[in-house]
């Protein structure tokens, strides 16, 4: 099949991780519940940060953008899953699949880069506190976030363009929850060696470079914390960084479960890793920040109950 013409008029079948009607009903309610919790949690984080002047700091500016990214990420994948669970027609167009893939790649990359910027923010706050205000100026924060968005958009466009060079033939059944690069390469009948090599090379750069930066930042942060004379100050500083460290561990852990394996051994039935990567991480991020960050403990609750409070 010609990659430029016939692919554009073809469809894929998103069969999900189970074809049993009973299991699909269970999965529908499970994913719907997780989606609603994710949306509510991340929207509350965004509203709490935007409405509380005490949270108008670089750390929470990046956290609000991380929540927006997670919100957009689950909205890109889960609604289509829910429709497929309830419908006999599980088709998704070629263009629709590429669109979903583009946003998937871009948003995961954006998550990754924002986490790296947040690590830099924590490094400056912990290791160079006297220079924090000037080092993390509003202009620099906007510039860093703009760079994150720009690189994410370009990386998403690059991988999506590479996939348009692939030829598909035979059954186009995707036993997966959404259109994923690895799954689509698995279905290809043309030679994907060059594309797979490019995918690994660019993926290592775009993901391992920020991971190395975050690791270096936290080594220096831990070293600085250990040199603090006061135990209470050590605990307070570590608690501030612990929430971000927890999110980073969850993000890279689930990402590794899905993608750190050769293409020919890639399991299309790897449902546990898929659910953790696609749903659990965005859902857990707001809870991690609320539990581990003192400033965020009551902020979402205040936003939630504000409409029911009587004016004084």
UniProtKB/Swiss-Prot annotation:
One of its GO terms (biological process) is signal transduction. Keywords: Cell membrane, Disulfide bond, G-protein coupled receptor, Glycoprotein, Membrane, Olfaction, Receptor, Sensory transduction, Transducer, Transmembrane, Transmembrane helix. It is found in: Cell membrane. Residues 1-25, 80-100, 159-196, 261-271 are extracellular. This is Olfactory receptor 1D5. Residues 50-57, 121-140, 221-237, 292-312 are cytoplasmic. It is a multi-pass membrane protein. InterPro entries: GPCR_Rhodpsn (IPR000276), GPCR_Rhodpsn_7TM (IPR017452), Olfact_rcpt (IPR000725). Disulfide bonds join 97-189. It comes from the Eukaryota. Its main location: membrane. Pfam families: 7tm_4. Odorant receptor. Belongs to the G-protein coupled receptor 1 family. It comes from Homo sapiens (Human). One of its GO terms (molecular function) is G protein-coupled receptor activity. The chain crosses the membrane at residues 26-49, 58-79, 101-120, 141-158, 197-220, 238-260, 272-291. GO terms for cellular component: plasma membrane. The keyword Membrane applies. The keyword Nucleotidyltransferase does not apply. PROSITE patterns: G_PROTEIN_RECEP_F1_2. Glycans are attached at residue 5.
